[in-house]
C-alpha cells in the first residue's frame, strides 16, 4: 500500500481527475465535537501542565497531523474495498447508530457491571439495529476508536521524540492484524466447538474492536498521569471489557438452541467465551505499553 505524501511539493497546474468515491457507509457524528483553544485553569496544576505540554509539543502536533492523514486514507480505502466485496445493506446494520446509542455504549464498555439484560432484541425475527438496542453490536465505535488510537499513538510517539511514518504505520497495522487474528481464532473455535448461534464475522469483528476504547483510555491516562495512571486505567478497562465480552458472547453463543446440547459441548462453548475474554488484557497491554514511558 503506497502513501502519497505532499510535504514540500509544489502544486502542479494540471491535476488528474480522481474517480468518484462510493457513498460513505455511515454518517460521521464525531464532527459535532470541536476542540476549544486555550482556557486551561490553574496553570500550576499537574493535569493542566501535562495537557499544555502535550498540545504545545510541535513534534506531537506533526505526528497527530500525519496520523490523521493515515487514518483518513485508510478509512477511504476500507470503504472502497467493502463496497466491492461486502453486501452494503447487510453492513449498514452495524453502522445504524445515533449519538444517544454511542454515549450509552461507551458508558457500558467502561462500566458494564450494573447492566442487567444482555439479550439482543428482535422484531419479527429480525434483530433491532444498534440505535434501538443497546446490546446490539456495532462497527461504528470500533472504527472511530481505531482512528482515534492511531492519532493518539502518533501524539505519544511525537512527545517521546520517536515519531516516524514507519513507526506509526507499524503501530496501526499491528493493531489491525491482532484484531483479524483474534476474529479468525474465534471463528475456528466456534467451528470446532460446533456452536449454533447467529454470530457472524461482523459480530466478532465488532466485539473484538471494542478493545480500542480501553486502549485509548489507558494511553491517554498514561500520558496525563504517568505509568501509575496507565496501569490503573489498564486494569480497570481490561476488567470491564472482560466482563462485557463474557456476558455478550455467552448470551449470543450459548443461546437457547445450544442449552439443550450435550454437557461437553456446553463446556467447550463456555471455555471459548472465557478464553476470548481472558485474551483481551494481553492484547491491550501489548499494543499500548510502548506508548507510555
UniProtKB/Swiss-Prot annotation:
The modification N-acetylalanine is found at residue 2. Residues 1-37 are annotated as: Disordered. Residues 160-174, 226-229 are lumenal. One of its GO terms (cellular component) is Golgi membrane. GO terms for biological process: endoplasmic reticulum to Golgi vesicle-mediated transport; protein transport. The modification Phosphoserine is found at residue 12. The keyword Acetylation applies. Keywords: Acetylation, Endoplasmic reticulum, ER-Golgi transport, Golgi apparatus, Membrane, Phosphoprotein, Protein transport, Transmembrane, Transmembrane helix, Transport. Residues 2-138, 196-202, 250-271 are cytoplasmic. It is a multi-pass membrane protein. It is found in: Endoplasmic reticulum membrane; Golgi apparatus membrane; Endoplasmic reticulum-Golgi intermediate compartment membrane. The chain crosses the membrane at residues 139-159, 175-195, 203-225, 230-249, 272-292. The keyword Phosphoprotein applies. Its main location: endoplasmic reticulum. Possible role in transport between endoplasmic reticulum and Golgi. Belongs to the YIF1 family. Interacts with YIPF5. This is Protein YIF1A. It comes from Bos taurus. The gene is YIF1A.
